[in-house]
Amino acid sequence: MRPRMWLLLSAQLAALHGNSVLQQTPAYIMVQTNQMVMLSCKAISSSTTRIYWLRQLHAPSSNSHHEILAFWDSSKGTIHSEGVEQKKITVFRDGSLFFLNLTRVKLEDSGTYFCMVIGSPTLIFGTGTQLSVVDILPTTAQTTKKSTPKKTVCRLPRPETRKGPLCSPITLSLLVAGILVLLVSLGVAIHLYCRQRRARLRFMKQFYK
């Protein structure tokens, strides 16, 4: 990349971020070291023939330093900048999508990555993708759900249902004995009533003779 172009990119980058012509996904990604990362940039215009990929190592500002990694050209393919490890960075196109593939990332690869096209007369940048490279991915803390106390429902005891015969043998014996006593008493009462009646009739016959 020519020095004049490098200075031009650095001077205009801060004011031209986030143009809707270039849409980048994802906006943020976190990966472990030695893993692979693929960033994408969608060009709204189908006439795009060259696209650049840049990396910003610090938070965006007017004095931020931007590093041009590589660019893709429709006639030349992938062109890497000087000092860039070519085996680590791959740039390719699939239709309206342009991809930046990073392999075996390290902690120093963290930063914000931008795709860019040279317009007329301005430079057009994508929305940017923030890459964070860590040794160990943070574990997601599980949210504890508050247990809702259950309402205590008072239930009345159910009457026990007895199974088997309703009366025991002793109860049946007492019941039969009571019936027999009643029958005997009734028989004695009837017998006495009959004797009294016969005696009354006999007395009346003797009285009227």
Swiss-Prot record:
<keyword id="KW-1003">Cell membrane</keyword>
<keyword id="KW-0472">Membrane</keyword>
<dbReference type="InterPro" id="IPR042414">
    <property type="entry name" value="CD8B"/>
</dbReference>
<feature type="topological domain" description="Cytoplasmic">
    <location>
        <begin position="191"/>
        <end position="209"/>
    </location>
</feature>
<keyword id="KW-0393">Immunoglobulin domain</keyword>
<dbReference type="InterPro" id="IPR013783">
    <property type="entry name" value="Ig-like_fold"/>
</dbReference>
<dbReference type="GO" id="GO:0015026">
    <property type="term" value="F:coreceptor activity"/>
</dbReference>
<dbReference type="GO" id="GO:0005886">
    <property type="term" value="C:plasma membrane"/>
</dbReference>
<protein>
    <recommendedName>
        <fullName>T-cell surface glycoprotein CD8 beta chain</fullName>
    </recommendedName>
</protein>
<feature type="topological domain" description="Extracellular">
    <location>
        <begin position="22"/>
        <end position="169"/>
    </location>
</feature>
<feature type="disulfide bond">
    <location>
        <begin position="41"/>
        <end position="115"/>
    </location>
</feature>
<keyword id="KW-1064">Adaptive immunity</keyword>
<comment type="subunit">
    <text>Forms disulfide-linked heterodimers with CD8A at the cell surface. Interacts with CD3D; this interaction couples TCR-CD3 with CD8. Interacts with LCK.</text>
</comment>
<feature type="glycosylation site" description="N-linked (GlcNAc...) asparagine">
    <location>
        <position position="101"/>
    </location>
</feature>
<comment type="function">
    <text>Integral membrane glycoprotein that plays an essential role in the immune response and serves multiple functions in responses against both external and internal offenses. In T-cells, functions primarily as a coreceptor for MHC class I molecule:peptide complex. The antigens presented by class I peptides are derived from cytosolic proteins while class II derived from extracellular proteins. Interacts simultaneously with the T-cell receptor (TCR) and the MHC class I proteins presented by antigen presenting cells (APCs). In turn, recruits the Src kinase LCK to the vicinity of the TCR-CD3 complex.</text>
</comment>
<keyword id="KW-0449">Lipoprotein</keyword>
<dbReference type="InterPro" id="IPR036179">
    <property type="entry name" value="Ig-like_dom_sf"/>
</dbReference>
<dbReference type="GO" id="GO:0042288">
    <property type="term" value="F:MHC class I protein binding"/>
</dbReference>
<feature type="transmembrane region" description="Helical">
    <location>
        <begin position="170"/>
        <end position="190"/>
    </location>
</feature>
<keyword id="KW-0812">Transmembrane</keyword>
<dbReference type="InterPro" id="IPR007110">
    <property type="entry name" value="Ig-like_dom"/>
</dbReference>
<dbReference type="GO" id="GO:0009986">
    <property type="term" value="C:cell surface"/>
</dbReference>
<dbReference type="InterPro" id="IPR003599">
    <property type="entry name" value="Ig_sub"/>
</dbReference>
<keyword id="KW-1015">Disulfide bond</keyword>
<keyword id="KW-0391">Immunity</keyword>
<keyword id="KW-0325">Glycoprotein</keyword>
<keyword id="KW-1133">Transmembrane helix</keyword>
<keyword id="KW-0732">Signal</keyword>
<dbReference type="GO" id="GO:0002250">
    <property type="term" value="P:adaptive immune response"/>
</dbReference>
<dbReference type="Pfam" id="PF07686">
    <property type="entry name" value="V-set"/>
</dbReference>
<keyword id="KW-0564">Palmitate</keyword>
<feature type="domain" description="Ig-like V-type">
    <location>
        <begin position="22"/>
        <end position="131"/>
    </location>
</feature>
<dbReference type="InterPro" id="IPR013106">
    <property type="entry name" value="Ig_V-set"/>
</dbReference>
<dbReference type="GO" id="GO:0050776">
    <property type="term" value="P:regulation of immune response"/>
</dbReference>
<feature type="signal peptide">
    <location>
        <begin position="1"/>
        <end position="21"/>
    </location>
</feature>
